[in-house]
Design a protein with these regions (language model features):
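Hydrophobic beta-strand segments within extracellular beta-sandwich modules
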Residues: 1, 95-97, 180, 184
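Short loop/turn motifs at secondary-structure boundaries
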Residues: 53, 82, 91, 103-104, ...
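Short, compositionally biased serine/threonine- and acidic-rich segments at solvent-exposed termini, linkers
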Residues: 4-121, 126, 130, 140-141
Length: 195
């Protein structure tokens, strides 16, 4: 936009202002990559969630990003919006990715994502800490036709769970099992997959 002003002496001045178009960001699950860093040597089972933006797939705008842990409604580990679409050191859970135009030109765009995390151990001793073996980030909203099977070292099924269950308490037929290695098989069928 160019504006011209003229005063009483016939002097004029031109000023050019650039207006950048801004659209509501378009965010799709295909833009999100969840990387499990647990397989790396020396890792402490940290997760990293990143948003890959290819060739301005979000639309026109100058965007910033935030992530909200829906389990406790905190923007973890960040206090607010940031310019980098990368979030690291997350635990398993359901997260809301939020994108907005940094100039406030459009409302937030949001997307819920599931970040799966399997615990390496649990301590079912009723102290309130790690008393249940729970798969974090799995629920019926994301995985409606899913199940979890837990086996002892000899292959005997000791527990069968749904993803929304409280978790496994380390018992079989009401009796506490010994401290040992147990194996699990989890079948996660996403909600958008039809049989």
């Amino acid at each position: 936009v160019t504006a011209t002003t003229t005063n009483g002496t016939m002097c004029s001045r031109k000023e050019t202002i650039t207006i950048n178009e801004s659209n509501i960001a378009t965010l799709d699950i295909s833009f999100v990559t969840i990387v499990d860093e647990a397989s790396n040597i020396g890792s402490q089972n940290n997760l990293s969630i990143s948003i890959d933006i290819l060739s301005n797939d979000l639309g026109l705008g100058d965007y910033q990003f935030a992530i909200l842990n829906t389990d406790d409604n905190t923007r973890t580990p960040f206090a607010g919006f940031q310019y980098q679409p990368l979030f690291e050191n997350l635990e398993g859970g359901i997260y809301k990715i939020m994108i907005n135009d940094k100039n406030g030109c459009s409302p937030d765009t949001t997307l819920l994502v599931s970040v799966i995390q399997f615990p390496k151990f649990f301590t079912p001793n009723s102290d309130g800490e790690n008393d249940y073996w729970v798969v974090k980030g799995a629920n019926k909203t994301f995985y409606p036709n899913s199940s979890i099977h837990i086996f002892n070292r000899y292959g005997k099924l000791v527990a069968q769970l749904e993803v929304d269950d409280q978790g496994w308490d380390g018992t079989y037929n009401g009796k506490t099992l010994s401290s040992d290695d147990y194996w699990f098989n989890i079948t996660l069928i996403p909600a958008d997959i039809t049989k």
